[in-house]
Amino acid sequence: NYGESGIVYPDGRLVQFTRAEADNIAEIGEAGVVMHDGTHVQFDRDMAAHHAGTPPQPMPVREMLAQPYGYSGIMKPDGNNRQFTAAESDNLVLVGPSGAVTADGKNVQFTDAGLPT
């Protein structure tokens, strides 16, 4: 929880603010903190949930999809299959009907046929 005098992190770690740090806080909200000097602190998912007093949401679970693109590879329209390497598979965070979210930030949009554009 982020308060006016310090922070209690989700892992239990405590941080006490100095008088100057405490005086610099302008507003504490659900997603972060705005300081009088114009800087801000953006909460990550766990910190925002902790600050709001809600338990963290579970990470998405991989599930089998009825489409040609999945976590382990792709079935191409010509009938050939391409198996992903372990690194390529690990880079896929979430695969859905309209695209894939990757850990390296290069998200993939799918066509109506479920193939990468």
Curated annotation (Swiss-Prot):
* Tissue expression remark: Calcified shell.
Q: Which Pfam families match?
A: Cuticle_1
> Which key words are in the record?
Cuticle, Repeat
- The residues bearing each sequence repeat, given as ranges, are 1-17, 26-43, 67-84, 93-110
> What domain of life?
Eukaryota
Which InterPro entries does the UniProt entry name for this protein?
Cuticle_1
Q: Name one GO molecular function term.
A: structural constituent of cuticle
Q: Protein name, please?
A: Cuticle protein CP1243
Annotated source species: Cancer pagurus
Q: What is the lineage of its organism?
A: Eukaryota, Metazoa, Ecdysozoa, Arthropoda, Crustacea
